[in-house]
Regions:
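Nucleotide-sugar-dependent
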Residues: 172, 223-230, 235-257, 263-272
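Nucleotide-activated donor-binding/catalytic signature segment of Leloir-type glycosyltransferases, i.e.
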Residues: 190-193, 200-227
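Conserved donor-binding/catalytic core segment of Leloir-type glycosyltransferases
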Residues: 116, 152-172, 177-179, 189-190
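N-terminal strand-loop element at the rim of the active site
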Residues: 1-42, 194-197
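Donor nucleotide-sugar binding/catalytic pocket of nucleotide-sugar-dependent glycosyltransferases
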Residues: 95, 110-157
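Membrane-proximal helix-turn-helix segments that form the acceptor-binding/catalytic region
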Residues: 45-56, 72-73, 77, 81, ...
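A charged, aromatic-enriched C-terminal amphipathic alpha-helix characteristic of glycosyltransferases
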Residues: 285-291, 298-336
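Short His-centered aromatic/hydrophobic patch
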Residues: 65-71
């Protein structure tokens, strides 16, 4: 097995934790996540060059394409040389509204052996027939081993602590949330994630506006989420742009695994799903009663019913997740024969 990965932070990676039979190929090229797409084009071109070189010289029997954009960047070569011999893992929507991009996504899916989607809302961009499309959830399996940590180590607070963890982006949307919740003594708003441009901008914005109940904690490791869960009352899972409207983010799963209510945005797939499943609420920070609505909803929450809802949603998610794993195992076992 050979893996090409993009080290966008140019930080040293601890590869010793992986199986020694895996050979890693590093593409080291610094690029900020929040950089404009026009500025990213040069980096994409360099990545394409390295990926093509590996595909042409590796003698591979099968390819797994993780995420949409890497697949698009080498789509011409995949369609010509690996049709029926690759898995297309579709995890982000971006430029599907552009005719060429949308058609190429369709072609990549149709020529794949299997296509996986991380959100059922992404199916609108894929063919409705011709290739199996399987829902593959972004669950970190180790999280399941820590599901009850919060029961034993929960730290209560008189304030409602709303926490975001992950890649901090969408400055304007988060400024609205800070405007609504900052300086409101009923709440604390916590951000965990790398302090790149948007995070620094939001931190400065909160300080400038005297929102001393808004905190930025910086970079963290995945396992730190178990600690965050023990001091969080609501997960901030609110996004708003065309690329995230249809996504199922990691925090959705953290919400149902750790049984923490989630705050989402109306008009998003996660907002629709969490309200339908009874695991969260969808509210728009443009609303003047945003803070009051959060307070009233949280204080009236039926905790017993909420936890049952989380358990039921997690059971449904794991059923699909394990079915996808079984399908992969069957495919690779057949390839090995």
């Amino acid at each position: 097995v050979e893996v090409l990965y993009w080290n966008r932070d140019r930080k040293e990676e601890n590869l010793n934790r992986y199986d020694s039979r895996i050979r890693f190929h590093e593409f080291s090229d610094y690029m900020q996540d929040s950089a404009p797409y026009a500025r990213k084009l040069f980096h994409f071109y360099r990545y394409r060059s390295q990926a093509l070189k590996l595909l042409k010289t590796g003698g591979f029997d099968f390819v797994i394409v993780l995420h949409t954009l890497p697949g698009i960047l080498v789509s011409d070569y995949l369609l010509k040389n690996f049709a029926g011999r690759y898995i297309f893992d579709y995890r982000d929507s971006s430029f599907e509204h552009i005719s060429f991009f949308g058609k190429r996504v369709m072609q990549l899916s149709l020529a794949s052996k299997l296509t996986f989607v991380s959100s059922d809302a992404f199916r609108r961009f894929l063919p409705s027939s011709g290739v199996p499309v399987i829902t593959s959830h972004n669950i970190l399996e180790d999280s399941l081993n820590h599901r009850d940590d919060r029961i034993h180590a929960f730290k209560a607070s008189p304030k409602i602590r709303i926490a975001f963890w992950g890649f901090i982006r969408h400055a304007d949307h988060n400024k609205k949330i800070i405007d609504r919740l900052g300086k409101d003594s009923r709440f604390e708003l916590h951000y965990y994630g790398r302090k790149q441009a948007v995070a620094k901008q939001l931190e400065t914005y909160a300080k400038t506006n005297g929102a001393d109940n808004v905190f930025f904690h910086g970079e963290y490791n995945p396992e730190d989420r178990y600690r965050f869960a023990c001091c969080t009352d609501i997960i901030h899972n609110s996004y708003w742009d065309n690329n995230t409207r249809f996504a199922m983010g990691n925090k959705y799963y953290d919400s149902v695994i750790f049984r923490i209510p989630q705050l989402t945005m109306p008009g998003t797939y996660m907002g629709e799903r969490c309200t339908a499943k009874g695991t969260g609420i969808a509210l728009n920070p443009d609303s003047s009663d945003y803070a009051d609505s959060i307070w009233e909803w949280f204080k009236s929450l039926d905790r017993i019913q909420f936890e049952k809802n989380c358990d039921a949603d997690l059971d449904a998610i794991l059923l699909e997740y394990n079915a996808g794993k079984d399908m992969l195992n069957n495919l690779f076992n057949a390839q090995a024969k």
